[in-house]
């Protein structure tokens, strides 16, 4: 039996697509590791990565905040802490079924980092969450998290009619995006 990761890597090799660690913003704009990858190959890479995500036994949830509704770091931190603690508490049996919960975060936003620690340590107990440094280039699941964030952000743009030409180039029109990317991902949503 081939693991989903090995299957993904095999499909890329067979299609002669370079295996660049997935990073949505860079893929869409041809930056960083995608600088020498053609638009066509970046589209094929996106399609293969979406297919890979569909095969994974994962679930995800989204905590989303609008800058107009959150005034300052303290308020953002408080909302994240409250919402995350509530989500974990409401699903405590599920979370307690694990001996350890590994939490990967790149510490990109201090408020998020503090809220993650506070909420999880409060609800689960201090020794359950295992905090690790996130390096998306070395971990496929972090790349999956980036893919999920990319699709979720772009879904908002399509819903508001603010999709860009770049979005349409990679994801198609609204209907195609909803069918090929959004709907597939929503099947993995937690709860």
Model-derived regions, located:
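Phosphate-ester processing/binding pockets and catalytic centers
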Residues: 1-191
């Amino acid at each position: 039996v081939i693991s989903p990761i090995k299957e993904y890597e095999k499909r890329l090799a067979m299609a002669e697509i370079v295996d660049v660690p997935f990073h949505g913003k860079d893929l869409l704009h041809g930056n960083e590791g995608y600088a020498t990858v053609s638009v066509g190959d970046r589209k094929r890479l996106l399609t293969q990565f979406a297919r890979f995500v569909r095969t994974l036994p994962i679930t995800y949830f989204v905590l989303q905040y609008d800058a107009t509704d959150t005034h300052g770091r303290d308020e953002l931190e408080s909302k994240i802490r409250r919402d995350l603690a509530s989500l974990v508490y409401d699903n405590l049996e599920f979370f307690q079924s694990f001996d350890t919960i590994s939490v990967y975060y790149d510490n990109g936003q201090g408020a998020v980092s503090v809220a993650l620690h506070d909420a999880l340590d409060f609800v689960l107990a201090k020794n359950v969450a295992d905090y690790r440094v996130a390096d998306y280039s070395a971990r496929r699941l972090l790349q999956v998290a980036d893919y999920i964030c990319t699709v979720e952000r772009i879904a908002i743009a399509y819903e508001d009619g603010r999709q860009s030409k770049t979005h349409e180039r990679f994801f198609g029109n609204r209907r195609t995006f909803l069918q090929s990317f959004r709907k597939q991902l929503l099947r993995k949503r937690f709860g």
